[in-house]
C-alpha cells in the first residue's frame, strides 16, 4: 500500500511541473505577415517577415518576394531572389510559381513566365487558383500592345 502511495505521489509530482510551451508552427509565425499583406501593408509585412526569420521555409521566401514586389517602390531584383529560393526549397510551391511568373511579366520575359505556367500546370494536376491567376496575367500581358 505504501508503494502505491509513493507511486501516486511521484506521478502527481511529475504532472505538476510547468508545461513547456509548444513551439509555434511556421504558419502561425507567418500569420501576422500574411495579415499585413492582406491589408496591403507590405512594408510592415517585410518587417514582420524579417523579424520572423524563417529562412528554411519556402512560404517565408515567397511572402518576402511578394511583399518586395508589391510595395510602393517595388524591389524586383530582391523579390526575384526570394522567389528563386522558395522554388529551390519547394519546386512545386504554387504561390512562388504564380508570383514569380507575374514578376517575369513585369520584366517583359513572357517566355520565362510561360515556363512558370507550365510548371504550375504540373503542380496543380486538377487545376488551382494560382494556375488560373497566372494564365489570366499572361493573357492580359499578351493583349497589351507592345
Map each language-model feature to its residues.
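Terminal, low-structured helical/coil segments at or just beyond the last alpha-helical repeat
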Residues: 16-26, 114-146
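Alpha-helical segment of the N-proximal tetratricopeptide repeat
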Residues: 24-52
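Residue-level recognition of tetratricopeptide repeat
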Residues: 34, 66-68, 102
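Register position in tetratricopeptide repeats
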Residues: 38-39, 70-72, 106, 123, ...
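Structural signature of tandem alpha-helical TPR/SEL1-like repeats
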Residues: 39-44, 72-85, 107-116
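Structural marker of alpha-solenoid helical repeat scaffolds
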Residues: 55, 89, 122-126
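TPR alpha-solenoid repeat register
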Residues: 60-62, 96, 130
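Canonical tetratricopeptide repeat
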Residues: 63-64, 99, 133-137
Amino acid at each position: 500500500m505504501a508503494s502505491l502511495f509513493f507511486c501516486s505521489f511521484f506521478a502527481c509530482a511529475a504532472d505538476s511541473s510547468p508545461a513547456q510551451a509548444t513551439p509555434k508552427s511556421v504558419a502561425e509565425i507567418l500569420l501576422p505577415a500574411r495579415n499585413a499583406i492582406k491589408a496591403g501593408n507590405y512594408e510592415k509585412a517585410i518587417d514582420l517577415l524579417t523579424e520572423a526569420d524563417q529562412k528554411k521555409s519556402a512560404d517565408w521566401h515567397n511572402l518576402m518576394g511578394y511583399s518586395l514586389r508589391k510595395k510602393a517602390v517595388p524591389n524586383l531584383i530582391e523579390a526575384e531572389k526570394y522567389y528563386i529560393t522558395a522554388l529551390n526549397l519547394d519546386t512545386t510551391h504554387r504561390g512562388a510559381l504564380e508570383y514569380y511568373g507575374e514578376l517575369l511579366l513585369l520584366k517583359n520575359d513572357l517566355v520565362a513566365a510561360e515556363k512558370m505556367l507550365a510548371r504550375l500546370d504540373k503542380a496543380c494536376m486538377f487545376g488551382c487558383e494560382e494556375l488560373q491567376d497566372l494564365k489570366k496575367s499572361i493573357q492580359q500581358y499578351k493583349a497589351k500592345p507592345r
